[in-house]
Structures are given as structure tokens and as C-alpha cells.
């Protein structure tokens, strides 16, 4: 992935911004056994973690801890991490993006959510117990950890990998069973990993032109200062400092920052924080009674460097809130890049069907993902994938965050469902689209399940709700049709999306977890709309568009509140072979036909000299 992402960590007196290294890629030669497994379409055996666990337990003894926690996240709480930060995957063998590993002197457990139950069951070896998060009767990872820490046992964790809030919560849970939590600055997994641990990737930091960003960074900093002035904490922002490996700065980036911010080495942040805490402690004026304002996503180690809870107020980052409300230039960029990205996906699906059906080609899931990348590269302003493409055939489609690997992936079966979840990073926006296709003859149940998911998708797209409504409140709009049939899906319905930034962005979203009830949806948010259905061991269905939240006109305005709705921006047709018009209402059929007419209008000009793709698009956008 060539995407550059920066996570903004902040505290005040002064403000600090942290630039996180982007995710890198690594490759290694395939063994004979891997080639044989590919040929036979067999899943790989789990990684044998016996020796790794033995080495870790020896280090635990040396550091006087009885239980050790291995989070998924890096020191910036990133969802997508560099290979060198994949500590949980290394120690457990489970490669999904979410989960937590806990190792005691005699047991090991891996907790993950419903997206990864199937994947984890296949990847964990006999040393591990799978804790299925959210399943009745299954303890949370915190509860399981507390059970292992009974009677005065000590639990250790790298304090840079969990937030201060999570550390406090865990500490309270442990106290109930007589355990305690300590931070161990030297990461024990890194020691076990040794020289085999991948190097941290280094990419160039570049400038996003104001023509695409919509607002110069000086205005954003000034808006942040005004926001902070209302917080009345220990000091105002008087300068901006960036802690970064400055060798990564392009000449343009260095020039833009010159005279406006102070550049300091990345690792200097902790010493600088300690100095701030000491200066506050020795202050004789009123500043000593104030607190530092710190992101609630900042690490426990940073909070400790500032003097801990008594010196720090943890809040949701105002930078996170500001990023979630796109400006008009960013919104127009989203619309434009989704037309180009839609054209790329249309070209890919037409190529794939022709290759499988007309040419009889044998293509595996990685071949498909690679071809899609090659097609996207042709389109203007493309920089790279926004995440690893989920190219999944048949049963693999039921693995919600499946990642095909060349050594183990399946050959695409033209007689099975094919789910493709992919996205691009364009200089004018970020895309994330999922379509489920069938190149043969789907079963009646597959068509019914597809219709139920599509109905939920349309229900979200058509939703109108008063300002102040959360994504939690509208999540059931997407699930209601599945619920009537006794079906459901184990993931959120929608997430925020960054503008040439993270494809998953907060603070708002649409889902059934309590977190989605915290922040209301707002005009100029960009979110995904992606209900699904998954039959383990058989197939998966997910239909995802990105939408812009916007104010809508209503006949009345109860309580003088504005009402909000959505504008779809993804331009990719739904699968005609899976569309059964008899399962849709007249209004739903009209929505599909109107959507397909717009897809044709926006994308067909790209294929005036591409008869294959144009014919495919014409067929897939015909009225139902």
C-alpha cells in the first residue's frame, strides 16, 4: 500500500503532531508445501507458536509478570499497522486486523470480534483458546485476564500500545480479583521476534495542495487554537511542534513547514512531555492547577510522561472532529474520485467475467486483486490502495475481513459467489466499495439473501432523520429486513471515511455497538453504507457505497431542527444475476433503476473505445 497516513497526537503547551510510519509490504519466497497447498486449494496449517510462547514466558519471568497482554495496535492506536508492529499476529498466528492476545504462564487466549471468528479458528494452533467477543457466556479479554491474575498476580503490557483510559479500566478489573497492572517499556514480543522482525518502513512525507485540501493548514491550526481557548486548561497553544523523522520530509513539505512549526526527532516526545510536567509542577502561578489536554487515543506511556491522571484531561481530539466535517472542496473531490474509481471497478468486473466465462482462465483471488490494482493505476490522481483488497470466492466471502495471500488463496470459482471489497487513495479523495457478483447461476436463497441486504442498503440511503441523530439510532434500518428472516451480520453498518486519509475514520459511524451512540451524524460527514450477510463455509454478501450526509428539505421542521439524509457517491452497478425484481418493492425497484441510470451517465463515457466493458456496463445497468 502506497498510502501515507499521519496520526495527529496532541497535547497542549505546546501542540504536538505525530506522524506515523505508513504500512509497508513484505514478500518472501514460497516453499514447495505452499505451492502444493495452492494447487490443491487447501488452507495453510496454523503457525506453530510453541517456541515463541516459551521464549515469551521466559522473558515474563525475568520481568516478574505472570500475564502479558499483546494488543493489535501500534503506538498510535492505528487500525492498519506496519508489519513491524504486527506483534499480536506474530505471537498468535492470527492475522486479522482486530483482536487482543493474552499469555499467562500456562495458557494463551486470543479475543476477536465476529468478523474474524472463522479466520481465527483456522489460524490459531492448539496452544490458543479463542474468545469470541460478544458471544453470550464468553468472557471479554479483560475478564479472562483478571481470571488469570487472581491472588496477587501481575499483568504486564507495553504502555505505548494501550490508551490511558484502557489501562485504568483494566487496572480496576484486575483489582477485583487481586491482580495488578504494570507497564513494561521494553516490548517483550520484539525481543522474541529478534532479527526476523521487519524494519520500519520509511516513505516520503509530501504536501497536499490547498487546491485539493480546500483549506490551508494555517487556517486549520488557527481554528484549533480558537477551540482550545474555550477549554481553559493549563496553557494556550503558543507554537506547533512536529515530532517526526525529518529525513522523510520532501523538499516541498519542508518548505511549507519552514518558519511555521518546529521540527523535532520523533522519539523526543516523551522527554519533552516529562519536561512539561516538571515545569508545571514547579510553576508558582495559576497554571499549576490546570491540566494538559490530551487525546483519549494517546498512549498510556504519553500520559505517564505528563505526570499521569492528575495532570491530564483526556478528551476526544478536536482534530478528529474537524476532519470528520469535510469542506466543499473535499466533498467535490470525493464525488469526482468515485466516478473514476467506479469506472475502474466496472472495467475490472467486465474483464474478470470475460476471463472466467469466455476465455476459461484459471485465476486466483490474488490475480484478481492485482488486476484491479493495475486498472486503478490508469486513472487520474491515483496514489495507491486505501486498504488490502478483499478478493474472495465462495466460502472465503464469509470471512468478513479476508485477505488473500498468493501462497494460500483460492482459485476464483465462476459457479460461486464472488465478493470484492476494495478502495483507492486518490489525491482528491478516498474510496471504499464492495460488490458481490455471481458469474454462473445463483441459488434462490442466494438471490433472496442478496435482496435482503440490498433492501437494507436502500433503507439507509433513503433515511431522513433530525439533526442530532446518531448512527446507533438508524442502524436497524439496514438490519430490519434480515431480522424478519431470522438473519443478521456481525459488523457495523457504516464507518467514517477520511479525505485522502484513513479509510476508516471516526468519531461517528453506523452500528449496533454503544460507541455508535456517542457522536451524532452531521452534515458533510462521509460514511460507508455496507450491510451484509454471511453463511459460514458457503458464501458472503456485502453491498457498500459511500455516502455524504447532508441537510435535506422536508415539508415540516419539527422543533425548528434541520433534517439530514444521504447522497450516494459510489458509481458501480449491482449484480443483475443476483437481482430478483419480484423480491423488491416498487419503490426499491425505482431506486435501483435510478441508481443504475446515474452510474451509466457518469461512467459510460470512459468506455467509448472499450466495447467489452461498455457492453457489460449496459447489461448491468438495464432497468429491472
Curated annotation (Swiss-Prot):
Cite the binding residues for Mn(2+) 1.
432, 530, 544
Q: What are the disulphide bonds in this sequence?
A: none
In short, the EC number is 3.4.11.9
Domain of life where this protein originates: Eukaryota
Q: Name one GO molecular function term.
A: metal ion binding
Concerning InterPro entries, the annotation shows: Creatin/AminoP/Spt16_N, Creatinase/aminopeptidase-like, Creatinase_N, Pept_M24, Pept_M24B, Peptidase_M24_C, Peptidase_M24B_aminopep-P_CS, X-Pro_aminopeptidase_P
Which positions does UniProt annotate for Mn(2+) 2 binding?
Answer: 421, 432, 544
The record's listing under CDD domains reads:
APP
Pfam families named in the record: Creatinase_N (PF01321), Creatinase_N_2 (PF16189), Peptidase_M24 (PF00557), Peptidase_M24_C (PF16188)
Its required cofactor(s), as named, are: Mn(2+)
Catalytic function, reaction form: Release of any N-terminal amino acid, including proline, that is linked to proline, even from a dipeptide or tripeptide
Provide a GO biological process annotation. Answer: proteolysis
**Which UniProt key words apply to this protein?**
Aminopeptidase, Hydrolase, Manganese, Metal-binding, Metalloprotease, Protease
Which cellular component appears as one GO term in the record?
cytoplasm
Q: Which family does it belong to?
A: Belongs to the peptidase M24B family.
The free-text function statement in the UniProt record for this protein reads:
Catalyzes the removal of a penultimate prolyl residue from the N-termini of peptides.
Quote the protein name from its UniProt record. Answer: Probable Xaa-Pro aminopeptidase P
